[in-house]
């Protein structure tokens, strides 16, 4: 759940940045209403229970509702939708409006079976992309912590040039507190 909350809290910090752009024609204080965060978990038996607990604490997930079979037919996925007003930081501390966190619209898709990453991408684009018709899609793996303005800069690349079809951000390894992560040769390299 630490990796999951690192990513979601980073996304919510970015939503706060979008909303802080009060002179923008696109964003501003209600900018959060133009953003939907889609979370896709690859397999109900594979997702860590503490990640589900984090989603439940944010109000997104309810335990005990998902069923394997409905009307004698196997279920492919379970979809939960909620607008949360709280975030869990990587230390599992609640952050809300008092800390500047803006509301966040979340769709959580809990796939019944583990069918790997590309299948999850298909779910995102074919199911949610068609329903939401977004102008820009940004895919993040769990554990990736976007900087507080990173998603804005990715969005801006698309906004400034309609010929841009893809963009990639810079990835930096987390050095840890007191740069202790540098003792790990993979991080240090």
From Swiss-Prot:
One of its GO terms (biological process) is cell wall organization. It is found in: Cell membrane. Its EC number is 2.4.1.16. It comes from the Eukaryota. The gene is CHS3. The keyword Signal does not apply. PANTHER family: CHITIN SYNTHASE (PTHR22914), CHITIN SYNTHASE 2 (PTHR22914:SF38). This is Chitin synthase 3. Belongs to the chitin synthase family. Class II subfamily.
